[in-house]
Amino acid sequence: MNEKVLKTLEYNKILNQLSEYACSPEAKKRCLALRPITDKAQIEQLQLQTKDALSRLFRCGNLSFSGVHSVNDSLKRLEIGASLSAAELLSICSLLEAAKRVKAFSRSEKEEVPDDSLTGFFTEIEPLTPLYDEIKRCILAEDEIADDASSTLRSIRRSMRGMNDRIRAQMNNMINNSTTRSYLQDAVITMRDGRYCLPVKAEAKSQIPGMVHDQSSSGSTLFIEPMAVVNLNNEYKELLLKEKDEIEKILENLSRLTANFSEQIAADYTILAELDFIFAKAAYAQTYNGVAPTFNNEGYLHIKK
């Protein structure tokens, strides 16, 4: 079937419609790349997969493949011993969550049914629940590591909270002093370069001994770290560095753990993308009440309007 015939049949329009039923970029790409095939055995195998997927949709309801995306770049980095970022690890978790959901779908039959052409795909999916749980235990968001990710991190952050309270108490005492307050643009505590500062009027700079870390665009306000809290700020800064080092260790440990399952993660992605592609065809058939045609060996095609 040449391109002229496909154009007459508005084949690309059909493919665009089909691709809307796929979730993952890979499955969408495969939908758009579909071309007619002539091998009868291959046709019948693909038709059987679509038929079995459609039967599962009728029996179990819709199946979502959200979260199915390639993590190949991250897996390649793991191969060379690199440490993944929190965002990369959460991305892998998103894929494993999809694997868990799709695996559960295959087990949601109310009655035992015979194996079909898709059983092998579902059987080979491994959600890696222990790995998923460990990553989610340690990483709350792309920019947030849980206090309990390690006992060391928990201890560091407890010290940070205590130091923060001491610094704020000292600076609040200064703000609450009527004389000191008269030298401030605002009675607030601000952060500059990771240091606690007070917004001091430029003309009153000499009245608040300390280190200038910044100034306003107009130059009327200087952000000064009072000498009274310099040592406390130094200790807090050291704790921040310790926190950063510990977070890097946590991510390194999680990366090493994830690297142990790289092959299975890659396999999960391949299977999920394939199932996404198959179920997209089934969902499309369901929407338009499609039926499987009967094929012949003569290459004869009869299209009914």
Enumerate the language-model features and the residues they cover.
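Short secondary-structure subsegments characteristic of cysteine-rich extracellular domains
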Residues: L84-K100
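Extended, charge-enriched "interface" segments that sit outside catalytic cores
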Residues: S108
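Alpha-helical coupling/stalk and coiled-coil linker elements that connect catalytic or binding modules
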Residues: M1-N62, I80-S83, K100, E112-S117, ...
